[in-house]
């Protein structure tokens, strides 16, 4: 992430994992936060701000459930977690996306903003 957004270098860690299916991937994101929070607060924030770019679900989903999804990613609220390390909180969020259609639609949305 720091290579794309240098101002975030060292602040967040994330990876995108292409799962062994023809059309589906996930983002595994870990962020250190300054303000202590809860899993419920995090999920409430994602749910409240859900839109065509970033959706939110609490349904138990798997990679095949997001095939043909046009959103940038779908946050899986069931997998949100908080890890406490030396008095600091690491927020763990997982989001699924269609690495074909979802990616294409996200590129179109990005181009519209340029």
What do these predicted ranges mean?
Residues 1-91:
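C-terminal substrate-binding/catalytic lobe of Rossmann-fold NAD(P)-dependent oxidoreductases
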Residues 18-19, 96-103:
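Glycine-rich phosphate/pyrophosphate-binding beta-alpha loops
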Residues 105-114:
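Internal hydrophobic alpha-helix adjacent to the cofactor/substrate pocket in enzyme cavities
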